[in-house]
């Protein structure tokens, strides 16, 4: 892992002040996939608008020289949430009986990958959360499987799969104990 130059992490609980930076860095992070409907910037904008209106919205952005270079955001999900309803097989009650953090997305500008920036953003985001578990969904094919392997190295484990929308690939659902 290469050590990155200093980054500043900023936490947001209101999308209005971070939306432009989120869209800008998303377009850089997902550039090779933007031609696919699920990854288009407009689709991300619609998702982030919807997610920011849900309970517990928090985003952490990393900045270098004033420019966004990475991001992650999350929400709180409750027992019975559509997130859990779309997960197959049904997750164990120990994960769903209490509110959980759903890490909706994390991304780092290509020039900042393999520098520890993603982990710093991830850890800063989870430090704002009180829920006992954090869950995320990942495309097992992302980065030729490297992204899934990275999450496993961070302590996440597979608990099922989900296809959140018809345009989405089938995703692995992973969980990690946060507290």
Regions found by a protein language model. Name each.
Residues 1-46, 59-68:
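Short amphipathic alpha-helix that is part of the acyltransferase structural core
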Residues 49-61, 76-82, 102:
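A short helix-loop-beta-strand connector motif used in the catalytic cores of GNAT acetyltransferases and
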Residues 67-70, 146:
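Glycine-rich acetyl-CoA-binding "A-motif" of GNAT/NAT acetyltransferases
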Residues 73-105, 164-166:
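Conserved acyl-donor/pantetheine-binding loop and adjacent beta-alpha core of acyl/acetyltransferases
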Residues 103-110, 114-127, 149, 153:
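Conserved acetyl-CoA-binding loop-helix of GNAT-fold acetyltransferases
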Residues 128-141:
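Conserved GNAT acetyl-CoA-binding A-motif
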Residues 137-140, 152-171:
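Conserved catalytic-core motifs of GNAT/GCN5-like acyltransferases
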